[in-house]
Structures are given as C-alpha cells and as structure tokens.
Amino acid sequence: MTQFFIGIMAMLMCMACEKPLMTGNQEEEETEGNLMIKVFEIEKTPFGSLTRATEEASAVCKHLNYAVYSTSGERLKQVNQTTGTSEFGTASFQLDEGKYRVVVVGHSSNGNPTMTDPTCIKFTNAQTFTDTFLYSDEMTVGEDQVELNVSLNRIVSMCRFVLTDDIPEGVKKMRFYYTGGSGAFDATTSLGCVNSKQDVKIDITNGDQKQFDLYTFLHDEEGVIHLAVSALDASGNELYAREFDVPMEQNHITWLSGAFFSGVSTTTVTGVTVNTTWEGEQHLTF
C-alpha cells in the first residue's frame, strides 16, 4: 500500500481539554504529513454558565492525546502532548491510504489515559479524574492532503460537593469513594464502559476549602452514583463519614451541599428535577 504524508489540521472547539510517547505502536509525531491536527482555540460552554466562550486550548486543558486506529480497532499511532511544549496543539501523522478512526482527548489529569482500545480509554485513580473532552470519528486518507477540523465535546458528569459547615480541627484529608460511574469511556459512544470504584483523596490545607469537584463517565446519559464521603485525620483514621445516592447527567453538574459534620450519617436524594438543556445544573442539599 502506497505511503502518503498525512497532515491533519484540527481546530479543537469544545462545548463546555505528555510529550510524544514512543513505545509499542505509539510513535513520535511526524513533522509533515497529509493529515495534520492543529489546535487554534477551544470553544467551550463552562459548567457554571450557559454562555459560550472561546479560549486557547492551553487555557482549557493540560493534555491533548491524539490516536489513530484501524477500522478493526487496532491502535496504529498515538501522540501525547502537554501544555508548555512547542508542539502543543499540532499533531501530524504519516499513514497509508485507507480508512481510519481518529480520536482526540483533552483533559487535565496527572498523566495520559490508556488508549490501546478505542472502546475502553482508561484513566486511573492515581491520575485523578478531570473535565474531559472527546472527538472521535472515522475518516479516509487518499492521495490528497487531508485537513480535518474537529470539535470536541464534554463527556463527563460532575458532582460538586459543598460543605456549609466548618471543617473541624484534626481533619487533614477528605476522601470521596464512588461507584455507579466509570473511570473509562468508549470513544465510539462517549459513554462509560467499566464499573469503576473511583477513589479521590484531597488534602485539607486550610479550613476555607469547602468545595470539591468529582468527575465520572456515566454508562448512559443519566445515572446515579453512590458516594461515600469520609473525613480523615493525619494518620488516615476516619473521623466522620456519610453516604449519598446522587443523580447525575452527562455534561451537567449536580451540586450536593449541606452540613456534613453535623448531619445524619446517611442521605438518599430522591425526586430531583434535571435541567435537560445541553449544559445545566441541579442543586441538592443534605
């Protein structure tokens, strides 16, 4: 099959974002090609607002991951980028003529997701879970240069946990352990693909820290996560604990707020009306 230089030009426009990896089938980015992905700016709809804003990619996410797969799902090429590097926002690949699936992921986790299989792109608890955006589609490479303009969409749901009472002395860490969502997603559907046990621990550096954002990939457009929240001392001993059943929706925030340290031990949230616009919020109290 004849080789062609492929250059992708990809303007990443998100509604609502490490260096090239060269192990296995992952290769260093080609400097020229007939398929080139270039990121100029990102159009996003912030979780907290129904208005759109356009920003540079580096203002929205810390990492961009580009992958090219065969139509059978084999990963052929991958380039990982982080902000602050000269190549951030531009990726170029050399491919044979044929059909491919192109996947671009934008996020701010502490590392790159595992992208071996496009139907199960995985983040880990150690990497943390953040606002995440996706482009995924099939395309054809022919004799002529291909410039592919892509638009990324937010695929996560967020639970914003807000404390309305003071954090007692001795609490050094908040732990959020939740099930019902997924730490991995299927790039062909944008939905969660595994039953994860997501575990997030956040250090408490001062008593003014009252808001904690938790992300997950739902298995459907709507779902419920079971959230166990605990406050730990410096030795990891549990001082306070409560549990919640939290309704979630893709691309939406669920605000969960209340007096954590002075309330009852278990709360179940029911009868919640969800804003069904593209981007919306629901406010729950406990």
What are the roles of these predicted feature ranges?
Residues P20, T82-E87, S109-E147, A234-G263:
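Structured interaction patches on ligand/partner-binding surfaces of diverse proteins
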